[in-house]
Amino acid sequence: MSYNRAAETRAPFGERQIFYHFPPRCSSKWQLLLNTDQKIFMPEITDTDKPKRLLSLDVFRGATIAMMILVNDPGVGGHIYAPLEHSKWNGCTPTDLVFPFFLFMVGVSVIYAMESKKATVAHSKLILKALKRTVILLLIPWVTQLIFHPDDGLAHLRLPGVLPRIALVYFIATVLYLKTSQKTRDWIFAAALIGYFIIMTFIPVPGVGYANLEPETNMGAWIDRLVFTPDHLWRESHTWDPEGLLGTIPAVATALFGIRVGSWLKCKDRDDQVKTNWMFTYGVLAVIAGLIWDLFFPINKALWTSSFVLYTGGLATIGLALSYWLIDVQGYKRFTYPFVVFGTNAITAYVLSGFIPHYMGMIKIGGHSIYQTLFAPYFSPVNASLVSAIFTVAVLWLVMWVFYIKKIFIKI
């Protein structure tokens, strides 16, 4: 098929006529034979013809980022409401849901970012672009640590972390989406969960002699000390890391969960009711499966156990289904704006959350901090702590709002 630019004309009603000449052997259901020259008429593509961006995705992602910022700086002096704290070990608090929800949305976003390009753009080009993003996400927290903790230098640089895990999961999920079928990804998802369960509960830990799920002696902790060395692990322990290397395997499964749900959401041959029903059903079944597996392999965010993947993935699916139904199907959009502001610049908001609270803490009013001046005198310690945390989120939102109205969307 060839395109003849000279044959392009302006049609009535502001439409555009483009004449394509097909070889005699070429046939297509899209051809409209107007004469013996086999010319076709195609209307100009307008904004209304383009696939609509699902507002619910930005809202769900934005709500997740807002919670990530809140729970990263949940209060002052240990006066923190229990739901804003991570579980001590086994179990799951609302705070423990935030990170898996974000990785779930990474998977959903891969579908929306890559589906149209998968068949038209060289996979090597897409993978190289994903690799560049991965390197940037890896470097951001390392550079940030060197800025805020210059005395530690490279000798005590924490290598694992939230952004490094996001980076690795994003890259692996992108490659799997581009290079494998959905059926193959389903098998990889199952193999990751079962394989991780076997590694953590049946294979003896070197130097310990038996498999276990304790913080300092489980297989993941041993691998982290071996690969990164204790000086490069989480500052609170130096013996294990909640975003350790082995836990990347089930974390990738969380993103694959999101890819599966995203493929349903993007399917054009199912109506909205069917999509919503499938998502609710799948979510509920996953939650039940996670709770059953919890009896043998406890739900644990730090270990990112297989039961944790199913439980949190199911809840994320239910939450996204509810958002999709209310916002994109029923049209309830009044409350969405604050979350869209965060959701359209999600990574930027999270990165800035590591800087802005630090500099806010340096601000003095009459020789006292913002917390001591505005909150501590008027609230109980735990409520003052909560209001202070919400205030930090609000300040970050104002920064992202300026980005939003200026149409500054930083894509790493």
Model-derived features with residue positions:
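Alpha-helical transmembrane segments and their immediate juxtamembrane cytosolic regions
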Residues: 9, 35, 40-412
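Aromatic (phenylalanine/tyrosine) cluster motif
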Residues: 3, 13, 19-22, 41
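Hydrophobic residues within membrane-embedded alpha helices
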Residues: 1-6, 17-18, 37, 94
